[in-house]
């Protein structure tokens, strides 16, 4: 952990595992406020909460939460408030699953907005895999935004009035094949890598390369170069082309800068200034 924006080292947290039961494979990390961080391990179906992440404090594991079995290997999550969180529903029955802070399923909501409703009905788990999404809440928790990893689709869900806005770009919905075992196998493009909702806009990093073209590349670099900026009505307002592919983003609107992770180099944190 580091201070921001000075990036002064504070401390490290998370015990180094000495066996399979002690290893944490982090799918995502969310800052929970009050010097705490939440870590999702999808392979174990668990959430870990670390406290004391601040100068002068000693970080420690405070909660080890086993998620309800209804969560089928969660790959992303976000805190929806002080008493609950949301995870994409990988069963295909709905779009989201909501849980309390003990990992118990509260309810499910919304549906995957696929055009082929017949395919959803017949192969729901495969569709959920093909529509794997990254999610982000707005700071006030009023908007929940999703972007699809395998398609050019962005959805905005208003938590107050139930309004749903669906944006489909030129590259269309996720393309995938359904195997005889019922799995969804990618067949089209690599699209969104990350999304962040701020007080004013939605920022998402987008690739768009076909898998067939990626396979031909001699030196494949993971990530995307295109930064898209949407308003809260789902309208694309700006596009920036970065000088390298990145996988994760953090936008500091007040500081007019973008922080991104470049996993293809040893210097993995890069900074961009924008208007």
Region locations from a protein language model:
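Blade-loop segments of beta-propeller domains
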Residues: 8-38, 42, 65, 243-247
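Short, conserved, GDST-rich strand-edge loop motifs in beta-rich repeat architectures
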Residues: 204-222, 269-272
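Short loop/turn segments that connect beta-strands within beta-propeller blades
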Residues: 4-6, 51-55, 100-104, 158-162, ...
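Structural signature of eukaryotic scaffold interfaces centered on beta-propeller domains
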Residues: 27-32, 75-81, 127-140, 187-198, ...
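Surface-exposed loop and turn segments in beta-propeller and other repeat-based domains
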Residues: 11-22, 62-70, 106-130, 163-187, ...
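Asp-box/WD-like beta-propeller blade repeats and closely related beta-sheet repeat scaffolds
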Residues: 43-88
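Beta-propeller blade signature
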Residues: 98-101, 218-234
